[in-house]
């Protein structure tokens, strides 16, 4: 009797077959068996795949597909011993295995989001989809990676600066006319600039910029000449214009015959004359008998206005 039991105990491991193929290791069907008693470790713990270990121990509780496959694992008999491999119960489980892929496919169709989530790597492997957090699965590049198109746009942004203004190509006739005008005067008035632009078929801005550049070039070629010209060519003093008609050497030239018309002469602008103008300096007084305004204005009317007041 003891010999028969020893022989049966020794013959039992002969039915145990270990498969080292990748499909058998990654097959989720072999992860659903309950734990054996202390005689040997549970097949589920012994045959865990690398993807399930990385996913974590709580993947089985979050995966609805695995809960459908193992309704007896959460039942009251979960702690009981599972039948030995090679027994009739195991053969019945192997006979029912072809139905489980259909259940998994059906569950994957009903719950596509959970099947594709990284919390269910076993269901993703069973349905043939690549696992994102697995070791060999393809990993999607983040949006900020160098391969994405957004960094390319950012690289092109510094190059997309404000376009530079095109330089004006002046013709030979335009350059000659501009040079002749610059020799005549280095600063143009508004009317001169407008007339010159219309005559040369240019805009006022083009003429103004050309004169600015030409003045800058001239100042570099003749340093200090512009300041000396301004000091030497100052305007004459207004007080030097009095006296002998319009032909004086120090005054501004006047029209011919101004000496005969005494009412066109201008007095000197001194402080006393501005504050207290004298009646003799104005030709409109009644003392001048040859004045054209004498018949219209009497002496009693003009004298109080032009008499000095203290």
From Swiss-Prot:
- Compositionally biased intervals (Acidic residues): 87-96
Cysteine pairings via disulfide bonds: none
Indicate the residues that the entry says bind DNA.
163-222
Bias (Gly residues) ranges? 230-252
Tell me which InterPro entries the record gives.
HD (IPR001356), HD_metazoa (IPR020479), Homeobox_CS (IPR017970), Homeobox_NK-like (IPR050394), Homeodomain-like_sf (IPR009057)
Predominant subcellular localization, coarse grouping: nucleus
Top-level lineage group: Eukaryota
GO CC, alphabetical: chromatin; nucleus
The residues forming the signal peptide are none
Pfam families membership: Homeodomain
**What Gene3D superfamilies does its record include?**
Homeodomain-like
Q: Which ranges are annotated Basic and acidic residues under compositional bias?
A: 42-66, 97-108
- Pro residues composition bias: which ranges? 140-149
GO terms, molecular function: DNA-binding transcription factor activity, RNA polymerase II-specific; RNA polymerase II cis-regulatory region sequence-specific DNA binding
Tell where it localizes.
Nucleus; Nucleus, Nucleolus
Q: Which GO terms describe its biological process?
A: cell differentiation; regulation of transcription by RNA polymerase II
Disordered: region residues:
36-165, 217-260
DNA-binding as a keyword of this entry, yes or no, is yes
Q: Where is the composition biased (Low complexity)?
A: 109-118
Keyword set, alphabetical order: Developmental protein, DNA-binding, Homeobox, Nucleus
Q: What does this protein do?
A: Transcriptional repressor. May play a role in early development as a Wnt/beta-catenin effector, hence controlling pluripotency and preimplantation development of embryonic stem cells. May promote adipogenesis in mesenchymal stem cells, possibly by inhibiting the expression of the antiadipogenic factor NR2F2. May inhibit osteoblastogenic differentiation.
Q: Which family does it belong to?
A: Belongs to the NK-1 homeobox family.
Q: How does it assemble?
A: Interacts (via the homeodomain) with HIPK1, HIPK2, and HIPK3.
What is the protein name given in its UniProt record? Answer: NK1 transcription factor-related protein 2
According to its UniProt entry, this protein's organism is: Homo sapiens
């Amino acid at each position: 009797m003891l010999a028969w039991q020893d022989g049966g105990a020794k013959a039992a491991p002969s039915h145990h077959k270990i498969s080292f193929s990748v499909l058998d290791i990654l097959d989720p069907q072999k992860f659903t068996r309950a734990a054996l008693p202390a005689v040997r470790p549970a097949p589920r713990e012994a045959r865990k795949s690398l993807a399930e270990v990385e996913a974590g121990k709580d993947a089985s509780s979050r995966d609805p597909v695995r809960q459908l496959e193992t309704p007896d694992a959460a039942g009251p008999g979960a702690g009981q011993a599972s039948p030995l491999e090679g027994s009739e119960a195991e053969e019945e489980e192997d006979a029912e295995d072809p139905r489980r892929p259909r259940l998994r496919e059906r569950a994957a169709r009903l719950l596509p989001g959970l099947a594709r989530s990284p919390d269910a790597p076993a269901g993703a492997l069973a349905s043939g989809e690549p696992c994102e957090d697995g070791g060999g699965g393809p990993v999607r590049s983040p949006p900020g990676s160098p391969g994405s198109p957004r960094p390319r746009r950012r690289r092109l942004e510094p190059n997309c600066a404000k376009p530079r203004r095109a330089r004006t190509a002046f013709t030979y006739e335009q350059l000659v006319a501009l040079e002749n005008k610059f020799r005549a005067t280095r600063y143009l008035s508004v009317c001169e600039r407008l007339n010159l632009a219309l005559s040369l078929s240019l805009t006022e801005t083009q003429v103004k910029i050309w004169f600015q550049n030409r003045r800058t070039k001239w100042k570099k070629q003749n340093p200090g000449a512009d300041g000396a010209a301004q000091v030497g060519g100052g305007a004459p003093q207004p007080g030097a214009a009095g006296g002998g008609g319009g032909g004086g050497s120090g005054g501004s030239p006047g029209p011919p015959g101004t000496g005969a018309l005494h009412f066109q002469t201008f007095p000197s602008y001194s402080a006393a004359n501005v504050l207290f103008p004298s009646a003799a300096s104005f030709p409109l007084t009644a003392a001048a008998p040859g004045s054209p305004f004498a018949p219209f204005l009497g002496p009693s009317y003009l004298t109080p206005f032009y008499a000095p007041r203290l």
